[in-house]
């Protein structure tokens, strides 16, 4: 297995590549990527592939997104310190760690698969992340106890925009969510809540695992 130094050097090259391609544009996202490399959030057998810009397997048949995809969503989110953020689909915990580094306050992330709740908690603890709260539940319904949110980031594809997520946004807040077909083709939507309704911006085609839940796909 590669040692930590080698893993980190490869990861730094990935970050440089994403900057050169104009995918990582802000200092905040760059800093978060350098603080929490993806190899801290995958199983040992996948660490040596963590710098490659592709999704990787995690337990329970799920995936951790490719670095470029995570960076794109974080740049769209335009996170600022002190913002109240909900992530739907914790997975490995990596994205929540990145978010927490930017907002510098408590982050709430919800995951429906118990095995992944435990996996993410272990990863976050090992990485030294203290301000991420992993909740077991149906993320398509959001998490009302900590609403309203400045930004909700969904890391799974929905058949349509889940109404509870819009309800749980602040006015002026935004939802970032892949919406489309059950498998492997969605469009990444940025949904801004205004006092008059919602405004939608389409950021193009993406491929995510399905969002399972009451306001997502059925099992």
UniProtKB/Swiss-Prot annotation:
Family matches, as HAMAP family: PIMT (MF_00090)
GO molecular function: protein-L-isoaspartate (D-aspartate) O-methyltransferase activity
UniProt protein name: Protein-L-isoaspartate O-methyltransferase
Protein's organism: Pyrococcus furiosus (strain ATCC 43587 / DSM 3638 / JCM 8422 / Vc1)
UniProt function note: Catalyzes the methyl esterification of L-isoaspartyl residues in peptides and proteins that result from spontaneous decomposition of normal L-aspartyl and L-asparaginyl residues. It plays a role in the repair and/or degradation of damaged proteins.
Cellular component terms per the entry's GO annotation: cytoplasm
Keywords, ordered alphabetically: Cytoplasm, Methyltransferase, S-adenosyl-L-methionine, Transferase
GO biological process terms held by the UniProt record: methylation; protein modification process; protein repair
Entry keyword annotation includes Ribosomal protein: no
Superkingdom assignment: Archaea
Subcellular localization(s) per the UniProt record: Cytoplasm
Description of how the protein assembles with itself and partners: Monomer.
Catalytic activity: [protein]-L-isoaspartate + S-adenosyl-L-methionine = [protein]-L-isoaspartate alpha-methyl ester + S-adenosyl-L-homocysteine
């Amino acid at each position: 297995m590669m040692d930590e130094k080698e893993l980190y050097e490869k990861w730094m090259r990935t970050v440089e590549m994403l900057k050169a391609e104009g995918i990582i544009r802000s200092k905040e996202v760059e800093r978060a990527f350098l603080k929490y490399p993806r190899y801290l959030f995958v199983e040992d057998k996948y660490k040596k592939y963590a710098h490659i810009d592709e999704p990787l397997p995690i337990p329970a048949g799920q995936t951790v997104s490719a670095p470029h995809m995570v960076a794109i969503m974080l740049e769209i989110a335009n996170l600022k310190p002190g913002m109240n953020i909900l992530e739907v689909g914790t997975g490995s915990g990596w994205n929540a760690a990145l978010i927490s580094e930017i907002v510098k306050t408590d982050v709430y992330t919800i995951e429906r698969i118990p095995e992944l709740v435990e996996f993410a908690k272990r990863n976050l603890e090992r990485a030294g992340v203290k301000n991420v709260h992993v909740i077991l539940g149906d993320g398509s319904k959001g998490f009302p106890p900590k609403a309203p949110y400045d930004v909700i980031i969904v890391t799974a594809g929905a058949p349509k925009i889940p109404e509870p997520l819009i309800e749980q946004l602040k006015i002026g807040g935004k939802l970032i969510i892949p919406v489309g077909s059950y498998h492997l083709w969605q469009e990444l939507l940025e949904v801004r809540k205004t006092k008059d309704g919602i405004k939608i911006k389409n950021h193009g085609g993406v491929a995510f695992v399905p969002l399972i839940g009451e306001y997502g796909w059925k099992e």
